[in-house]
Amino acid sequence: MDLLAKILASDPTTPRLTMYDENSGARLDFSGITLDNWAAKVANMLIEELDLAEDSLISIDLPPGWQAVAVALGALAADIPVTLFDAATSDVAFIAENDAQDAAENAVESEASGSGEYSGDVVIVTNDPFGRGVEETGGTLLPGAIDFGPTVRFYGDQFAQPTRSLADIVADVLPQSLHRFSPTSRVLVQGWSNWLDFVAKVLAPLAAGGSVVIATGDPDRLTPERLDRIVDIEKVSERLP
């Protein structure tokens, strides 16, 4: 799979995505190999489980975190267009269990009854830092919804179809962003507002061969002092607003 070929060719074991969840206290590292494996699993799930194609659209309605990145990379590997925070227009909506429970329930009910506009699949993603599913963390899965954690793990970590490189994909969307980063870039982000913002903050540094640190948490936990500490610990080269 060529999506992350630049990273895999240079140093496949170096952390390329680091996740700080200050609410849970979790810190997770994802190497190029690990990201590639997750992208393949998601791509296989999108095609085999959800029967999506190039003319489909998925919406990632998830808080900042590694699972949002994994879903995005998988969609790009499968050449399936992505939007953020716009479930109503999508064929499949990836929705956070806690942050968007009402939206998920409405979408599932619309699909079941045929009374609403939404007719796609709903995939529920927990906020568990290790990617466990709804039922695995003691929750109850909404009728008609798909539990992301146990479902995606079923699929292989190799994707057989041809893929474009992440650099080519970013160049089509935000060509100027590629020149901003280098293989030594290690950027800190706290979130994104839309797809272009996600491309600029997360995909562009990865496409350049760099790495990304995502830090999330309540303001009383993720204080300016804590962010400064993360910058020092992770040797961050740039903080993106």
Could you describe each region identified by the protein language model?
Residues 92-182, 232-241:
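ANL superfamily adenylate-forming
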Residues 18-52, 153-181:
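Conserved AMP-binding/adenylate-forming core of the ANL superfamily
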Residues 1-18:
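A short N-terminal helical cap/helix-turn-helix that marks the beginning
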Residues 2, 40, 69, 199-200, ...:
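Residue-level marker for well-ordered alpha-helical positions
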Residues 174-184, 194-240:
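Conserved AMP-binding/adenylation subdomain of ANL enzymes
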